[in-house]
Amino acid sequence: MGDKTFFTLPKPLPGRLNVVFTLLQKPPRIKGVKWVSGDPKKVLKELRKMGYKSTILGGGAYLNTLFLKKKLVDEIVLTIEPKIFGKGLSLFNEDFDLDLKLLSAKKINHNSIILRYKVLH
């Protein structure tokens, strides 16, 4: 995730390594957080060397766009909630075309649905 997203959280997400992309020169030392910068492909390679087989990108528009343009995303999971925010938050910060294939649609409660898509590169 990006540092803007991370700093909206009350604390690091439990039970996992929180990898946070940042441009901060001296990010704070926080248990369970790995601060990174630079090429996402290199970061993913380093995580694989550490034994991680899969990752979840919980980024904002900038990171989502960066990872997709580098073809580093193989699935997109969207949660549909019964709430409309007007302009809302953008998922991406640039225009591009992306073809998806629906893998699953799961109703998680009486109002919410999780859609899982495969990214077709």
Enumerate the predicted regions with their spans.
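Enzymes that bind and transform nitrogen-containing heteroaromatic metabolites
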Residues: 1-121
